[in-house]
Amino acid sequence: NLFLINVTKERNFSYGVWKNRQHIMINIKGGNHIGWGETKVSSNQPDFDMSAWSGQFKKLKGMMLGDAIEEVRNQFLAGNWKPIVTEGLLMTLYDLMGKIENKPTVKIWGLTGEAPVPGIFCILEREETMVVKQAQIAVDQNMHRYVKIKMFGDFELDKKNISALRKFLGPDSFIVGDPNQGYKHVKDLQKLSEIMIALNEAGMDAVEDPSNLSKEDLIYLQANVGKLSIIPDKIMRPASKSINYFDD
């Protein structure tokens, strides 16, 4: 079963605006159990066609659970199915497997770590007043220890919003800036380093994808921004390829 959810909360990015976005909830039944999953499938398409989207994986119906998981993985690794299909499907299938075996998925995978993984509250606003308003929601929901704020590649705007967020949250919150490569207009890495240091001084603890950077660029930047943490994102996807790229 598929359920389309239209989310109408506006989201602002350095590259544009999501007026709305479309998520699909998936459930798959096996025996007396139901597995659930979710994936974001599009943005600014309120009339998204679920039938066309789901047509490619109808072949999974009737398969044994392990075979279905293997098929989804193989289709992804072969480049036939995109992550917007495979992520939700694998989430659903592993949820179903965990319920059938009465085990957490991490145990099925043979993982032994049990350290908590913090959730991160995301703020996607351009206006300072709205940034603070969202920060108040994070505090109200006890999700203010780790906060991500969208940035726009505009130094003065980003600095103003980060400063306001730090002032509101205080010194104990970890603030991650995410410009979605919004500073790619800054071609000189030393200049980019100086901008990142200034944003760190304004209150930003880490930054994700400040520009379109190679592995070597990331290494250089991290070595030249003091205590600020540089977080690669786009270059890490898909993990099936980046694991080899970063293992050199």
Residue spans for each PLM region:
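Catalytic beta/alpha-barrel core
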Residues: 124, 146-155, 176, 180, ...
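Short, charged, surface-exposed secondary-structure boundary motifs
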Residues: 132, 239-244
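Well-formed, non-transmembrane alpha-helical positions, independent of function
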Residues: 137, 198, 220, 244-245
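Short, surface-exposed basic-aromatic patches at helix termini and helix-loop junctions that form
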Residues: 167, 222-226, 246-247
